[in-house]
Amino acid sequence: MTKANAFSRTADASPDTNPDQTDRQFWMSVLARADLSDLESYWQTLSPAPEYRHLRKPEIGMAMVRGRAGGTGSPFNLGEVTLTRCVVELDAGVQGFGYVTGRSRRHAELSALFDGLMQQHSALHGPALIQPLHQQWLARREQVSRKAAATKVNFMTMVRGS
């Protein structure tokens, strides 16, 4: 399976975008949104577990979130969000980065580890880890959309004098 097939975002990339960068952005976003329990489960299946060292231990901080009115208007500061970040280096010398919303140090650490592993072996870990996690996220998003759609109210306006 090629990267273009394994990571659907590659096909949407502009000509100026590096496909490897687009793939990495995609899997990093999937890892950041994944459930910690799913990442832990996959980590337990790796035998032997890869050796690594922390370049930056998991640490908690804040970031400003920006929004746009209507999704297209002028940007404005929406508010701050708690982030946890981590940087690891695998024995092969590959650096992995993990950024997650919230305060889960372990989630950021596992995200960084899997980022490093994906840089080395994306053909191995992409279908086994990234694709199932992405499908789970899509299913959760669809469920939330259906629940919200069930509460939607349609207002009709009546024309006077008809």
Annotate each PLM feature.
Residues 1-47:
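Charge-rich, low-complexity N-terminal segments
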Residues 12, 16, 82-87, 128:
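N-proximal short alpha-helices
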Residues 20, 24, 47, 119-162:
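Cysteine/selenocysteine-centered motifs that mediate thiol-based redox chemistry or coordinate metal-sulfur cofactors
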Residues 33, 82-84, 104-107:
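Generic alpha-helical scaffold signal
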Residues 36-37, 49-52, 123:
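A general structural signal for well-ordered secondary-structure junctions
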Residues 42-92, 97-98:
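Structured beta-strand/loop patches that form or line metal/cofactor-binding pockets in enzymes
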Residues 92-131:
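A hydrophobic, small-residue-rich beta->alpha segment in the mid-to-C-terminal subdomain
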